[in-house]
Amino acid sequence: MILESNVYVRRIEAVRSLMSSKGIDAVIISGSDPHASEYPASRWKQVEWVCGFTGEAGDVVITQDHAGLWTDTRYFIQAEQQLAGTGVALHKTRIPGEVRIPQWLADYAFADRWGSVALAVDGLSQPVSFINELENAFGCRQVRILDLPDMLDDLWMDRPAVPATPVITLGEDLTGESRLSKLGRLRSFIDGKNCDAILVTALDE
């Protein structure tokens, strides 16, 4: 049962109004951050803000007539409890017969739409493989993927800022190896692969 007094019901309706004003058919809200961190900073807890789900893995899709949370087996019970009264449906992943977000959008939400479909994503937090999967799911049909990383800023008035915590250096008594030694080994590895550089994006790496 959807509870009209539920704060998340109101937030989802606000997202839908914003979508209408921008000509967006569906918005995909990532539960990750630009570094694909398992535990993102408060600024990127967009899924929690919009539907109340606090699990570490989950993405939300909102259309004008459906809102759904995609999460895996670790969080099924938690999701059912936290989504109660929000009107957000639980879509289970990592199970036989799962329907991933791109397939659901193409084959269910907009199966009868042959005109252009506009999808909003946070391009900073979605990997290129996911964008490719979206495009492939729609095949020859027209789909516009809009990169709107700060779309919720218009609604999330007290959204936390990007963290500016000072960087600290851990001593060798904790790391077991100096920074220079690690960089030296990494450069030797790069040379051995005949590469010029390596891109490291995960914060814990």
Where do the protein language model's features map onto the residues?
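Nucleotide donor/acceptor-binding cores
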Residues: 115-117
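N-terminal accessory/capping or targeting/presequence segment of soluble
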Residues: 1-110, 122, 126, 130-205
